[in-house]
Amino acid sequence: MVYLIFQTFFRYILYIIGDIETLDYNFLRPEFHLWYVVSLSFWYLLAILLNKLNLNTFGKLSVFIILLGISFISRWYTDGIVEFVQENYYEEFTSYTLSYQRTLSFMPFFFAGFFMTKNTFTKIYSSIKNIKIGTVLFICSMFLVFLIVNDFYGIEALYRGSFGTYRFLDDGQGVTVYITKVISHYIIAGWLCYLIMNLASNKKSIFTKWGDHSLTIFIFHPLAVFLLRQTEFMSDWTPNTKLAAFLLISIPVTWILGSNNFVKGTKYICNPYNFFIKMVVHFKPANDKN
């Protein structure tokens, strides 16, 4: 329901600012960040089905390895699958349709957390004892990632998760380079996730508040992006200067979207199911005991 509401909303916004010429509500191609909502729905559905199997530790590990294998090879076949579906079933099918490729690409990260026990999570969260060391490792790792993304062809496209090999392999590069790049993707992304988990604090702060309000921040942050795209004052800036500016701008944007007032004002459209339940309870006859 959240996807339907905000897909409609953002399609209308894109029409107003002129990014699309015709106002249509294409629900098969998620706009901007909404791919995650679609992918999350598929992952939750699969998780519910797997939960019914009552898997033991070996079963969970086996299923995870299978899912990781599917994810690992999926981008090798993306272009062929897209072409096959376009020719035989749906001409407008792409790797973006219903977040098809990203659902497969990022599936291991969701199920790594899904299958992990609370005890394992606790050990990971507390494995770096010194917060200063963790912070230095994270900053250095992020710096290296920026260098890698800038210096190696197709790495950014690889991390986006939505493209086939034509976007991250040069002509003539084969399965060996594919395996190397995809492995590096999972290792680096997993390492950054590990560092972020260790930097998370149990103490109440503005960051934990933003974490509690992450859905609202996530849903509405494209409004700031669309606004910046309509301005031209950064057009002559270098990429690094733009990056620094965007990082600075993200702070007040997150502050506003994560504020109590904004969250309170948008809670019903961000959580439509809860709103529906409250309305049912509110209008339920007082003498109706059932």
Describe the function of each predicted region:
Residues 59-71, 131-142, 211-218, 270-271:
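Central hydrophobic cores of alpha-helical transmembrane segments
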Residues 124-208, 213:
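Alpha-helical transmembrane segments and terminal signal-anchor/GPI-anchor hydrophobic tails
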Residues 200-214, 222-290:
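C-terminal "closing" transmembrane helix and its immediate cytosolic amphipathic cap
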Residues 5, 14-121, 228:
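Hydrophobic alpha-helical segments with transmembrane-like composition
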Residues 35-48, 106-116, 187-198, 247-260:
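Hydrophobic cores of alpha-helical transmembrane segments in multi-pass inner/ER membrane proteins
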Residues 49-54, 112-124, 148-150, 197-204, ...:
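Structural signal for the C-terminal ends of transmembrane alpha-helices
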